[in-house]
A protein has these predicted regions:
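Basic, low-complexity intrinsically disordered segments
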Residues: 1-174
Length: 174
């Protein structure tokens, strides 16, 4: 759920800046409690504090064409997370990055099976949602999943650089 939310944030950032990405990279860092409990026997690494932790999971997905479409970014990041993560381990940190980011020039090679009208409709919807968020705050338009247990989107939207910004509506308090 959190990875899907992070991919959605990435989608809005790319859309706002009129950028597209050729691939995304996901890194999942595990908590040291996995080693401290004594049951973990996999690969390890040393963190910046000198503690032994499980080796982080890392993976990249390349797209057929550069994109900033939410459907692609969200679905592919969720699949990548499922593929690279050890479900038996406690996750401490998740990082998602867009790679080979270029300006969105709107002209990309598509195959005969791509529904270009559907893609354009999705882009327009993303731009409309972004306009609403910019005008009324980041929490003005949310998916229902942002209200599920374990979701962090609403709290993330009220932060600046990972720290509390004061308001729960995603707007800065004056």
């Amino acid at each position: 759920l959190i990875v899907r939310e992070m991919a959605e944030i990435l989608m809005f950032r790319l859309t706002e800046k009129k950028l597209v990405t050729e691939s995304i990279t996901l890194e999942v860092g595990y908590d040291r409690e996995n080693v401290d409990k004594g049951g973990y026997r996999g690969l390890t690494q040393t963190d910046r504090y000198g503690r032994i932790i499980p080796k982080a999971a890392h993976g990249t997905v390349r797209f057929d064409a550069p994109t900033n479409l939410g459907s692609t970014l969200i679905n592919e990041s969720a699949k990548l997370f499922e593929r690279i993560t050890d479900p038996a381990l406690t996750v401490r940190r998740i990082t998602i990055n867009a790679n080979k980011v270029t300006p969105d020039e709107g002209i990309y090679q598509v195959d005969f099976f791509t529904d270009t009208k559907k893609l354009e409709k999705e882009k327009k919807l993303q731009q409309a949602m972004l306009g609403i968020k910019n005008k009324y705050g980041k929490n003005a338009v949310l998916k229902a999943s942002s209200y599920e247990e374990g979701a962090t989107m609403r709290q993330r939207n009220a932060q600046i650089g990972g720290h509390s910004a004061g308001g729960s509506d995603g707007k800065l308090q004056k």
